């Protein structure tokens, strides 16, 4: 999980949008999908956090990013997840690349009919893991439909991105993870 997280940071340690003019958006989405699948099997961030810390330092060194640190990489991952979940609110051009990757990866995912809504769900899990790493939260929570009623009145407030509240009506699982992310970062 730690290595996948370093790969889903397109502006720092991760797969870039382009390698020698080749569109790598599908590979970026593949990393996000893999992170979400691994997350579903993970209860604790130990030893993921240690692996992540070690690999971030290595990847930053390989790329000679001397002015970049772990927090910058986590923010890069978080911003990518936010941009997907808000359908381009942070960067519309990058969102178009993510959409291209989502469309192109459909033929490789056989467990479900992968869509933008699936990607938003996966991005919300990535955001939650990222926030957990930012706040040293080790215990991971997982969505189940039986806990949905207790979140019906939940609301994400400013200065966090309140557009995420729209997910409550369209993708409740994604809203759940964004709300848990909000709760973690609210006190950070």
Regions found by a protein language model. Name each.
Residues 1-111, 117-188:
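Catalytic cores of NTP-dependent nucleotidyl/adenyl transfer enzymes across multiple folds
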